[in-house]
A protein has these predicted regions:
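Conserved pre-motif I regulatory segment
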Residues: 2, 11-17, 33-81
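Walker A/P-loop
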Residues: 74-99, 104
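Conserved SF2 helicase motif VI
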Residues: 82, 203, 367-391
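Conserved helix/coil segment N-terminal to the catalytic DExD/H
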Residues: 134-165, 176-177, 181-185, 347
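Post-DEXD/H (motif II) to motif III coupling segment of the RecA-like Helicase ATP-binding lobe
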Residues: 164, 172-240, 412
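A short beta-strand element within the Helicase C-terminal
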Residues: 342-343, 352-365, 390-393
Length: 421
């Protein structure tokens, strides 16, 4: 298409060479074994499985969770797919305890690391838990929690045989940008653990790199369906909000095709559109609203439209916030002190566990299945109230926007949402 791709490599290599050795992801083990057996090659598997650990705990599971965990234990490695709100972290902890091996739990954000650590501490004494983050390395005798960024900067030779089990949380992110892929490749291929698992709500990627994730961790060992958890999460209703905004010539290239960046900038800056969004925010000022956009500038514009008394009831998450400020903002939302949370899709994609949320505003278009379904999942978590989950999907008056909504509509249907359009 003649577009600049920056430093993006043409090919992504999943193997590396070290002298006469070829290092291949463990997820390909079953395929290699089949070919070796057919060719009658002699081979040995040198993976780490000598660090047994007795957790002496019982992680309570629903029937569907127990079936999933048992299947993963039997398979030995692979990917567990479970919808948002189904208890992925709970199942991951139970999986480690059932395996009975010293384990490493990998996340891509500190927030997610802390949430997973806190959940594990409900079942496993903290003296058996450790963290590798922020340059500090504390290895736990039971489970160690680490961010992928910190691990990638360590000398992993010291950790090669340290763990017999590895859990990669939100593993669909493993095959993200080339930089992220290099990080995950370095870390996952450097660990000799026999048991490697991935946890995710959806293996789908908009770039089609699902097979890359499976190459590192193995195929899907179990998939929990929406119907399996329908009694554990609340249903959501989706309302299509027609903005009436038509496409402008500033959004088009010379040849008449849509310039996506210009389109997003135009929609984000459109005063009439933002005032329509404000109207729905004011209507639900007593509810707990999650407002998502692709641009922080757009979120700021809508936030600034709120009356001063409602700005006091709003939090705006951004990547420049300190860890403490972000944690405090989330805690205030969890406690019901705030009614509005503004965030980009990327910031809200994973690790945002606020059961009180019951309204979702998708104020700029996206058709990424993982993003849409995870965003909806944020408002479907059960709490002690009799809450109703509502999604507002803002759709503009031009063909691309309507087509994108049609795509999202199919995603909503897949997770049993009722859609009014």
């Amino acid at each position: 298409m003649g577009k600049w791709v920056g430093n993006t490599p043409k090919y992504l290599y999943l193997f590396s060479e070290n002298g006469v050795d070829v290092i291949i992801p463990v997820g390909l083990l079953s395929i290699l074994k089949k070919y070796f057996n057919l060719a009658k090659y002699n081979y040995s598997i040198n993976l780490s499985d000598d660090k047994k650990f007795k957790f002496n705990t019982n992680v309570e599971l629903y029937d569907y969770q127990k079936i999933a965990v048992d299947s993963c234990v039997k398979k030995g490695y692979g990917i567990l797919i479970a919808p948002t709100g189904s208890g992925k972290t709970q199942m991951g902890i139970a999986l480690i305890c059932n395996l009975g091996y010293k384990a490493l739990w990998i996340t891509h954000t500190t927030d997610l690391l802390n949430q997973s650590y806190d959940r594990a501490s409900q079942y496993v004494d903290k003296k058996y838990l450790g963290k590798i983050t922020g340059g500090k390395k504390q290895i736990g005798s039971g489970i160690t929690f680490a961010t992928i960024q910190t691990l990638a900067n360590l000398d992993l030779l010291d950790l090669k045989n340290e763990f017999n089990a590895v859990i990669v949380d939100e593993c669909h992110r493993l095959a993200g940008t080339p930089t992220k892929l290099k990080q995950f490749s370095k870390v996952v291929n450097s660990l000799a653990a026999r048991h490697k698992y991935g946890l995710t709500a959806t293996l789908h990627r908009s770039d089609g790199l699902e097979k890359t994730t499976m190459a590192y961790l193995g195929s899907v060992c179990f998939s929990i369906e929406e119907n399996d958890v329908k009694d554990k999460i609340i249903s959501a209703t989706v309302f299509k909000i027609n903005t009436g905004i038509k496409i402008d010539t500033c959004c088009l290239d010379i040849d008449g095709t849509i310039n996506y960046n210009n389109l997003i900038n135009y929609l984000a800056a459109n005063e009439d559109r933002n005032k329509l969004i404000l109207r729905y925010l004011l209507k639900d000022k007593q509810e707990y609203n999650l407002i998502l956009s692709q641009r922080i500038e757009h979120l700021i514009s809508v936030y600034n439209l709120l009356p001063d008394e409602l700005k006091e009831k709003a939090v705006l998450l951004n990547s420049k916030m300190s860890k403490n400020s972000r944690e405090q903002a989330i805690l205030k939302m969890q406690a019901g002190e705030k009614n509005y949370m503004f965030a980009t899709y990327s910031l809200a994609k994973e690790g945002l566990d606020i059961k009180r949320l019951n309204r979702l505003h998708l104020i700029l278009p996206t058709k990424d299945k993982a993003v849409v379904q995870q965003s909806v999942g944020r408002i479907r978590r059960c709490d002690e109230s009799d809450k109703k989950a509502i999604v507002y999907d803002y759709v503009d008056d031009f063909i691309k926007s309507q087509k994108d909504f049609k795509t999202r509509k199919s995603f909503y249907k897949n997770i049993n949402c009722e859609v009014f359009d």
